[in-house]
């Protein structure tokens, strides 16, 4: 359990509210302060006992805490860090929940004192958004990557580890650039592929075609319903790595296209077989059975 006497959650959407709920459910006894832009979000968070204090000013929330968690889209997190920097107490650690780390760590180095920021990325979420979609179990058993820049002290990273462990997550350490290369393949490429698939299927007469869409369509395009602001930030701040993964994906699609055009159906069958084997290996690596979410 984290020993932080006070934690500030800057942003009470899906990720931030779920973090507060997870900490409370698992016995965190310290003070939880939060910032949210909308008055109705602040009121609901207080009424449900999700946080102890809900502010309309991020400085006020951050000033109460020894650990601050930025739960906003990546570029908005940079702006929020600049806002709260003057209010931070000595010894306060700042972390985040964003899906890219290299660009963010570089930006934070110009805003916060050395050793204050430790990036983190809980590999959990939903295409749903907002406080209403939050769950105390969102982080349960999920992997959170703690991606500290070289200037970050190990003690600060350990405090971020403890935060996510207290929320029910497993943690691992990675360099920010290594994190971005891996997540470009496992998260960012799948999102672009889902978006492209939804766009291609709905290109003409979407209303008429929709009646014929089954579970395969919904399963393979679900994430395309996610936050546009969040995903635009992710792709913009990890563009080279995502582009490299798209190149590999494009080669696979083009090969199947060529084989279909040429009538090489044996090659198509081998492609499908290799794809199934690859998926099974990926699921083993994550420790999940087929069909598990």
Question: What do the predicted segments below correspond to?
Answer:
Residues 71-73, 98, 148:
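Glycine-rich, N-terminal phosphate-binding loop of Rossmann-like dinucleotide-binding domains
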Residues 58-88, 92-93:
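Rossmann-like NAD(P)-binding element
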Residues 137-222:
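Internal alpha-helical scaffold of NAD(P)-dependent oxidoreductase catalytic cores
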Residues 6, 31, 116, 143, ...:
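Residues at the starts of beta-strands that form the adenosine-phosphate
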Residues 207-275:
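Interdomain hinge/lid region at the active-site interface
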Residues 1-63, 67:
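NAD(P)+-binding Rossmann beta1-loop-alpha1 motif at the extreme N-terminus of oxidoreductases
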Residues 80-134:
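Rossmann-like NAD(P)(H) cofactor-binding subdomain of soluble oxidoreductases
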């Amino acid at each position: 359990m984290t020993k932080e006497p006070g934690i500030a959650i800057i942003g009470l959407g899906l990720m931030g509210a779920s973090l507060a709920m997870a900490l409370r459910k698992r016995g965190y006894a310290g003070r939880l302060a939060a910032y949210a832009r909308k008055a109705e979000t602040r009121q609901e968070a207080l009424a449900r006992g999700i946080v102890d204090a809900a502010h309309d000013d991020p400085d006020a929330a951050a000033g109460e805490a020894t650990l601050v968690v930025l739960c906003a889209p990546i570029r908005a997190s940079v702006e929020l860090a600049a806002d709260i920097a003057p209010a931070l107490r000595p010894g306060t650690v700042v972390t985040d929940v964003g899906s890219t780390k290299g660009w963010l760590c570089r930006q934070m180095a110009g805003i916060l004192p050395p050793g204050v920021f430790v990036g983190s990325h809980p590999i959990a979420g939903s295409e749903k958004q907002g406080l209403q979609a939050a769950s105390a179990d969102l982080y349960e058993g999920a992997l959170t990557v703690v991606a500290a820049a070289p200037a970050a002290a190990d003690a600060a990273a350990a405090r971020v580890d403890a935060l996510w462990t207290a929320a029910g997550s497993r943690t691992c350490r990675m360099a920010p650039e290594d994190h971005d290369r891996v997540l470009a393949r496992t998260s960012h490429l799948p999102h672009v592929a889902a978006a492209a698939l939804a766009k291609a299927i709905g290109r003409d007469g979407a209303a008429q075609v929709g009646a014929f869409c089954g579970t395969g369509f919904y399963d393979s395009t679900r994430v395309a319903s996610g936050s546009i602001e969040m995903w635009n930030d992710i792709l913009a701040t990890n563009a080279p790595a995502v582009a490299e993964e798209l190149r590999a994906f494009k080669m696979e699609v083009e090969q199947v296209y060529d084989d279909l055009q040429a009538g090489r159906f044996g090659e198509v069958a081998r492609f499908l077989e290799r794809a199934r084997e690859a998926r099974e290996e990926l699921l083993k690596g994550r420790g999940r059975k087929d069909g598990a979410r």
